[in-house]
């Protein structure tokens, strides 16, 4: 874990105002329905980011981090990795993430990222990048080769 359970995502010193944010579900190409959190920039964004969390999945920290991205002018979607093995509910301190991490696959994770990228493109974003933490950092790096 990259931070304690109650940690807050940092604010940029140049942060503006974010547009709306909301919880949503995305459907991967294999039919898996994953939790996600969308945060929109207050102005039309040219850049979007898929936030790839640590091993805990879509923890509140990463939902808030998506909003921080929107505050600097990027549309963002934070995704959850556990659509194929866990319900779409809370990922706070009590979530047994390790049993789900062990069942995940790189192929499933790639499909989840593709769903996030497709969602941002539907919003009109032209350039998309990934930002990953812990396990998500390794998969973010891997996405750059695909």
Can you describe what each PLM-predicted range is?
Residues 1-146:
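N-terminal cap/leader regions of alpha/beta-hydrolase-fold enzymes
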């Amino acid at each position: 874990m990259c931070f304690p359970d109650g940690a807050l995502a940092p604010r940029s010193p140049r942060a503006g105002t974010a547009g709306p944010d909301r919880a949503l579900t995305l459907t991967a190409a294999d039919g898996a329905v994953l939790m996600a959190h969308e945060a929109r920039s207050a102005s039309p964004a040219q850049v979007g980011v898929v936030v790839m969390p640590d091993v805990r999945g879509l923890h509140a920290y990463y939902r808030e981090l998506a909003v921080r991205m929107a505050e600097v002018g990027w549309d963002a979607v934070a995704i959850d990795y556990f659509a194929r093995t866990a319900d779409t509910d809370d990922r706070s301190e009590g979530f047994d993430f390790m049993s789900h991490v062990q069942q995940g696959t790189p192929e499933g994770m790639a499909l989840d990222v593709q769903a996030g990228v497709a969602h941002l493109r539907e919003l009109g974003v032209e350039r998309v990048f990934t930002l990953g933490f812990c396990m998500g950092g390794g998969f973010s790096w891997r996405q750059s080769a695909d």
